[in-house]
Curated annotation (Swiss-Prot):
UniProt similarity note: Belongs to the cyclic nucleotide-gated cation channel (TC 1.A.1.5) family. CNGA1 subfamily.
Keyword Transmembrane found: yes
Name the record gives this protein: Cyclic nucleotide-gated channel alpha-1
Binding positions (3',5'-cyclic AMP): R553, T554
Organism: Mus musculus (Mouse)
The encoding gene: Cnga1
Length: 684
């Protein structure tokens, strides 16, 4: 048999041309099956390419080609190659595909909704629910978790501290008393239970208030709920608060109602009482009195606890067994509850204050208790009494300092043989200052405050008074603040002259309190009486050109009684006006208008221009400044010359030091082999 061997080099030579259309159909069927998603244009282009390939093979079937070339021109491979290329070129972007999918899904939904209206309603409800859930989630995420926060420096927080202090003090005083005096617990059990559980409710409410109490972080109040809770939990007080609300009352079921000492854990909330006392001390206007009363309360509580312990020890030893313990309760006189407590309180007071005069102890346990009481009395009461003494001395410190000043002035007047009338006037003036609380030096008190707070206090106190002056009514706020800080309070006695006619005016005055009289030269005849809010001397400190009175006083002003005035000096006003030139011109214009109304302005002199005296003063000032600059320049020049001389001396020293070294190096270079030695020395 003869076998036909197919030559792979000419794979299409022995194949008849009739087989090609069948292969093309087969390839087209594969293409249509694999690429049905392509458009009709793509299919048309593929068919054109396949026809071109047929003609190409018919014309070049007998030409020699390599395997790669034959492979490229095979009908099937060529078609698939072109399909892949066209799919890569015509591939749509992802966004367009997504849009097409959305459109298809919407169209499908519409078709389904037309068919099933119930499904449509269900889908709409589901969509609404999803939208609501998304909105709530977004709100929760966007919210900063801010809640109603209590400001720790506000009145609400302070009032709550007062509310929580009451149950704390109740527990600290009554639990120990009820535990030691059985009648007190059994006779009023219903009332104690009500008070106990009301205090427990207040304790629980206090824990909630703590989680809503803000704190300052970089000067800003923190209002984040989670931060507040985390800060409270991280604090030691949270653990104490939890321990203080543990329901130990359940032990009543086992031990009975006569054991109120099981509620001793309620005493752990004492820090709230201390906080209330501290805030009250800062708020009250009488801090020394409050401190003293606070210490007295501590003393009473210590004596109360010691009295209860004494009675319980007497009960343990046996009433009336010896002279030291409480007497026999079978005696009607000592069987009453009031007598039991008062007797124990009396014994505790005598013991802790180390006064004594109590029956001596008999048993060893009694001796130990008395020794402990004496130690407590010595340590605690010594500190408490010392604090009270220091507080009382602080309360009298101002009076003592004031009295020392008065005594020093009295000694001076006696030494200088001052008349008795003058001495009486001085003493009366000091008495007026003390009784009216005008001994405080405002500058000394406000010295420790920052400038901003000091200015605000001065504005609150003096700004309204300064605005009453006509020339300052329309001035800038900044200038008024500057002037307010420069006002000086002064007090004048009855009959004192504030100013006399013809005196040079260097100050203006504003009456804060009191009455002043404009009197004649005899000092008796009164023309006008000035009262609170009046002012005078404002024109003289402006030194307006053309004033007929110049800068001298035009009237005699005398104090009728004790008068409080504010004084503003000319130098302070001019210093403030240097930063406000527009305000200066406005004040001068107002002063001219006032003088024109009163007929005290010479218009010709006012319109003459600048005064030659002022020009001379300016020239002298300029000459002085030039002289100062010359002296400074000469000093700088002398310093420069001295520095230059020192630099020259240093350079000469360096030359002397380096000259022999350089000469030796150059001499070594001139010798044969010197260069190599020099390089070796440099390398070393």
């Amino acid at each position: 048999m003869k076998t036909n061997i197919i030559n792979t080099w000419h794979s299409f030579v022995n194949i008849p041309n009739v087989i090609v259309p069948a292969i093309e159909k087969e390839i087209r069927r594969m293409e249509n099956g694999a690429c049905s998603s392509f458009s009709d244009d793509d299919n048309g282009s593929l068919s054109e390419e396949s026809e071109n390939e047929d003609s190409f093979f018919r014309s070049n079937s007998y030409k020699r080609r390599g395997p790669s070339q034959r492979e490229q021109h095979l009908p099937g491979t060529m078609a698939l190659f072109n399909v892949n290329n066209s799919s890569n070129k015509d591939q749509e972007p992802k966004e367009k595909k997504k849009k097409k999918k959305e459109k298809k899904s919407k169209a499908d939904d519409k078709n389904e909704n037309k068919k099933d209206p119930e499904k449509k309603k269900k889908k709409e409800k589901e969509k609404e629910k999803k939208k609501k859930e998304e909105k709530t989630k977004e709100k929760k995420e966007e919210e900063k978790k801010e809640v109603v926060v209590i400001d720790p420096s506000g009145n609400t927080y302070y009032n709550w501290l007062f509310c929580i202090t009451l149950p704390v003090m109740y527990n600290w005083t009554m639990i120990i008393a009820r535990a030691c005096f059985d009648e007190l617990q059994s006779d009023y059990l219903e009332y104690w239970l009500i008070f106990d559980y009301v205090s427990d409710v207040v304790y629980l409410a206090d824990m909630f208030v703590r989680t809503r109490t803000g704190y300052l972080e970089q000067g800003l109040l923190v209002k984040d709920r989670m931060k507040l809770i985390e800060k409270y939990k991280a604090n030691l007080q949270f653990k104490l608060d939890v321990l203080s609300v543990i329901p130990t009352d359940l032990l009543y079921i086992k031990f009975g109602w006569n054991y109120p000492e099981i509620r001793l854990n309620r005493l752990l909330r004492i820090s709230r009482m201390f906080e209330f006392f501290q805030r009250t001390e800062t708020r009250t206007n009488y801090p020394n009195i409050f401190r003293i009363s606070n210490l007295v309360m501590y003393i009473v509580i210590i004596i109360h606890w010691n009295a209860c312990v004494y009675y319980s020890i007497s009960k343990a030893i046996g009433f009336g067994n010896d002279t030291w313990v409480y007497p026999d309760v079978n005696d009607p006189e000592f069987g009453r509850l009031a007598r039991k407590y008062v007797y124990s309180l009396y014994w505790s007071t005598l013991t802790l204050t180390t006064i004594g005069e109590t029956p001596p102890p008999v048993l060893d346990s009694e001796y130990i208790f008395v020794v402990v009481d004496f130690l407590i009395g010595v340590l605690i009461f010594a500190t408490i009494v010392g604090n009270i003494g220091s507080m009382i001395s602080n309360m009298n410190a101002a009076r003592a300092e004031f009295q020392s000043r008065v005594d020093a002035i009295k000694q001076y007047m006696n030494f200088r043989n001052v008349s008795k009338d003058m001495e009486k006037r001085v003493i009366k003036w000091f008495d007026y200052l003390w009784t009216n609380k005008k001994t405080v030096d405002e500058r000394e008190v406000l010295r420790y405050l920052p400038d901003k707070l000091r200015a605000e206090i001065a504005i609150n106190v003096h700004l309204d008074t300064l605005k009453k002056v006509r020339i300052f009514a329309d001035c800038e706020a900044g200038l008024l603040v500057e002037l307010v800080l420069k006002l000086q309070p002064q007090v004048y006695s009855p009959g004192d002259y504030i100013c006399k006619k013809g005196d040079i005016g260097r100050e203006m005055y504003i009456i804060k309190e009191g009455k002043l009289a404009v009197v004649a030269d005899d000092g008796i005849t009164q023309f006008v009486v000035l009262s609170d809010g009046s002012y005078f001397g404002e024109i003289s400190i402006l030194n307006i050109k053309g004033s007929k009175a110049g800068n001298r006083r035009t009237a005699n002003i005398k104090s009728i009684g004790y008068s409080d005035l504010f004084c503003l000096s000319k130098d302070d006003l001019m210093e403030a006006l240097t930063e406000y030139p527009d305000a200066k011109t406005m004040l001068e214009e107002k002063g001219r208008q006032i003088l024109m109304k009163d007929g005290l302005l010479d218009i010709n002199i006012a319109n003459m221009g600048s005064d030659p005296k002022d020009l001379e003063e300016k020239v002298t000032r300029m000459e002085g400044s030039v002289d100062l600059l010359q002296t400074r320049f000469a000093r700088i020049l002398a310093e420069y010359e001295s520095m230059q001389q020192k630099l020259k001396q240093r350079l000469t020293k360096v030359e002397k030091f380096l000259k022999p070294l350089i000469e030796t190096e150059f001499s070594a270079l001139e010798e044969p082999g010197g260069e190599s030695e020099l390089t070796e020395s440099l390398q070393d």
